[in-house]
Curated annotation (Swiss-Prot):
A GO BP annotation: cell adhesion
Species whose genome carries this gene: Pseudomonas aeruginosa
Gene from which the chain derives: pilA
Keyword DNA-binding: no
Subcellular location(s) per record: Fimbrium; Membrane
Signal peptide per UniProt: none
Chain positions with N-methylphenylalanine modification: 7
Family: Belongs to the N-Me-Phe pilin family.
Assembly information from the UniProt record: The pili are polar flexible filaments of about 5.4 nanometers diameter and 2.5 micrometers average length; they consist of only a single polypeptide chain arranged in a helical configuration of five subunits per turn in the assembled pilus.
Post-translational modification: O-glycosylated; glycan consists of 5NbetaOHC47NFmPse(alpha2-4)Xyl(beta1-3)FucNAc in beta1-O linkage to Ser.
Name recorded for this polypeptide: Fimbrial protein
InterPro entries xref list: Bac_GSPG_pilin, N_methyl_site, Pilin, Pilin-like, T4P/T2SS_Core
Length: 154
């Protein structure tokens, strides 16, 4: 008798079934991971502007996100993000009330995942110098674990 070479059909079917089960578990986990990572990155990009905002407040200048600020204004130095709606400096909406309160707002869009697209990140400063972060207007596919601990969904 000749020795068997190769695999039987049932062995191949078992391997395909195992790979299918592993993929069914891994793909949703990976999608959640990428969504969390994108939200965390966007929050970090917006939060990084707090230092520039503090400098503007100390100098008594109005905080703006503009390529051509006036002498009485301070550009926070934001560069374009692939995760936020809009283009260039307009991706960040700045509200400076000139009383020490500031609000930096960005909307997730562009290349961000569909589960997080449209969520709004707001980083705000009270006049006592305390900064807060919150995420609002989340899409229906949003999961609670997407928001980082330092910027909860409200």
């Amino acid at each position: 008798m000749k020795a068997q070479k190769g695999f039987t059909l049932i062995e191949l079917m078992i391997v395909v079934a195992i790979i299918g089960i592993l993929a069914a578990i891994a793909i949703p986990q990976y999608q959640d991971y990428t969504a969390r990572t994108q939200v965390t990155r966007a929050v970090s990009e917006v939060s990084a502007l707090k230092t520039a905002a503090e400098s503007a407040i100390l100098e008594g200048k109005e905080i703006v996100s503009s390529a051509t600020p006036k002498d009485t204004q301070y550009d926070i130095g934001f560069t374009e993000s692939t995760l936020l709606d809009g283009s260039g400096k307009s991706q960040i909406q700045v509200t400076d009330n000139q009383d020490g309160t500031v609000e930096l707002v960005a909307t997730l869009g562009k290349s961000s995942g569909s589960a997080i697209k449209g969520a709004v990140i707001t980083v705000s400063r009270k006049n006592d110098g305390v900064w807060n972060c919150k995420i609002t207007k989340t899409p229906t596919a949003w999961k609670p674990n997407y928001a980082p601990a330092n910027c909860p969904k409200s």
